[in-house]
Amino acid sequence: MHFFQSSLVAATMGAALVAAAPAADLETRSSCTFTSTSALKSGKASCSTITLHNIAVPAGETLDLTGLKTGTTVVFDGTTTFGYKEWEGPLISASGTSITIKQNPGGKIDCDGARWWDGKGGNGGKKKPKFFSAHKLNKSNINGLKVYNIPVHGFSIQSDHLTIKDVLIDNSAGTKLGHNTDAFDVGSSTYITIDGATVYNQDDCLAVNSGEHITFTNGYCNGGHGLSIGSVGGRKNNVVNDVTISNSQIINSQNGARIKTVYGATGSVTGVKFQDVSLKGITKYGIVVQQDYENGKPTGNPTNGVKVSDITFEKVTGSVTSSATDIYILCGSGSCTNWTWSGNSVTGGKKSSKCKNVPAGASC
């Protein structure tokens, strides 16, 4: 039997002592344990607490947590695994309002991404499933998930009022062949908080492509491409506003604190703050702002269609490797304005001779 509704049993036992509750109330209180995706699909609508016990998701299927009843709690218990197939995914999808997703002690979500890794990520080779779609997961919380070896792209976030706390994404086994393993991609979202994330990966630890009122704090990012705004431009939504990245470490990564916008595009990046961010072992740029991205690559020729204003870099400190560049700022004419630059110190690398249109107060 794939699931059990414990509250219905309790309600039956207590019938002689209390008046019977309406059926709708019983359904709302029901607690269900599922051991298969088929049982989850057919039974989730009647459950207010869902426990996923040692789920083995069949190849080519999504663990479907969409359309959950308002206020549902989902608990990952034991080890969650996924069958192998070349497809786009996602491996997990969740939506709903006032949802809590968490994990029991000792639990883990093991994607076994090595089966897909070929060094090409999403740019060719095997078709790789994305990990977790958090679209329309509103006024909700994701707490304490431990995730291992995603094939490509981690959490895709398009939600409002979503808090993600104390999540581990450990793709350290993909150092050689893992690629495009972004941890958190945020787009068209408002009031997103990511607190206490620990990430070992091979791409952006955080990438905010659009959205407002976004906080990333107390993070640890190792091995990837750093904490990024962008690239901004060329999408339906090209506005980033009020983003705070604070009290975080970026270790052994390609970049540290980064803002990048698309060549020839329009949009805006405003109210972004990098505060108390420490760097170590950065291999390309410690602090970087570039307005020259075309087809995903820098051109060296910045444009000014995306305004980058009211930006704060405060106490971004640490070291890069000797072959890296401490700070690189490449702005379009007049597009980078009203920056606050305070207490930043990036050392160990080269000084750039290619900076352009550096705003007043900043240094390059």
Curated annotation (Swiss-Prot):
<feature type="disulfide bond">
    <location>
        <begin position="355"/>
        <end position="364"/>
    </location>
</feature>
<comment type="function">
    <text>Involved in maceration and soft-rotting of plant tissue. Hydrolyzes the 1,4-alpha glycosidic bonds of de-esterified pectate in the smooth region of the plant cell wall.</text>
</comment>
<feature type="repeat" description="PbH1 3">
    <location>
        <begin position="211"/>
        <end position="231"/>
    </location>
</feature>
<feature type="disulfide bond">
    <location>
        <begin position="205"/>
        <end position="221"/>
    </location>
</feature>
<dbReference type="GO" id="GO:0004650">
    <property type="term" value="F:polygalacturonase activity"/>
</dbReference>
<feature type="active site" description="Proton donor">
    <location>
        <position position="203"/>
    </location>
</feature>
<protein>
    <recommendedName>
        <fullName>Probable endopolygalacturonase B</fullName>
        <ecNumber>3.2.1.15</ecNumber>
    </recommendedName>
</protein>
<dbReference type="InterPro" id="IPR000743">
    <property type="entry name" value="Glyco_hydro_28"/>
</dbReference>
<feature type="repeat" description="PbH1 4">
    <location>
        <begin position="240"/>
        <end position="261"/>
    </location>
</feature>
<dbReference type="InterPro" id="IPR012334">
    <property type="entry name" value="Pectin_lyas_fold"/>
</dbReference>
<feature type="repeat" description="PbH1 6">
    <location>
        <begin position="303"/>
        <end position="324"/>
    </location>
</feature>
<dbReference type="GO" id="GO:0045490">
    <property type="term" value="P:pectin catabolic process"/>
</dbReference>
<feature type="repeat" description="PbH1 1">
    <location>
        <begin position="159"/>
        <end position="188"/>
    </location>
</feature>
<dbReference type="InterPro" id="IPR006626">
    <property type="entry name" value="PbH1"/>
</dbReference>
<comment type="similarity">
    <text>Belongs to the glycosyl hydrolase 28 family.</text>
</comment>
<dbReference type="InterPro" id="IPR050434">
    <property type="entry name" value="Glycosyl_hydrlase_28"/>
</dbReference>
<dbReference type="Pfam" id="PF00295">
    <property type="entry name" value="Glyco_hydro_28"/>
</dbReference>
<dbReference type="InterPro" id="IPR011050">
    <property type="entry name" value="Pectin_lyase_fold/virulence"/>
</dbReference>
<feature type="repeat" description="PbH1 2">
    <location>
        <begin position="189"/>
        <end position="210"/>
    </location>
</feature>
<keyword id="KW-0964">Secreted</keyword>
<feature type="glycosylation site" description="N-linked (GlcNAc...) asparagine">
    <location>
        <position position="338"/>
    </location>
</feature>
<keyword id="KW-0378">Hydrolase</keyword>
<feature type="repeat" description="PbH1 5">
    <location>
        <begin position="269"/>
        <end position="291"/>
    </location>
</feature>
<dbReference type="GO" id="GO:0071555">
    <property type="term" value="P:cell wall organization"/>
</dbReference>
<feature type="disulfide bond">
    <location>
        <begin position="331"/>
        <end position="336"/>
    </location>
</feature>
<keyword id="KW-1015">Disulfide bond</keyword>
<feature type="signal peptide">
    <location>
        <begin position="1"/>
        <end position="20"/>
    </location>
</feature>
<keyword id="KW-0326">Glycosidase</keyword>
<feature type="active site">
    <location>
        <position position="225"/>
    </location>
</feature>
<keyword id="KW-0961">Cell wall biogenesis/degradation</keyword>
<feature type="propeptide">
    <location>
        <begin position="21"/>
        <end position="29"/>
    </location>
</feature>
<keyword id="KW-0325">Glycoprotein</keyword>
<keyword id="KW-0865">Zymogen</keyword>
<feature type="glycosylation site" description="N-linked (GlcNAc...) asparagine">
    <location>
        <position position="138"/>
    </location>
</feature>
<keyword id="KW-0677">Repeat</keyword>
<dbReference type="GO" id="GO:0005576">
    <property type="term" value="C:extracellular region"/>
</dbReference>
<keyword id="KW-0732">Signal</keyword>
<feature type="disulfide bond">
    <location>
        <begin position="32"/>
        <end position="47"/>
    </location>
</feature>
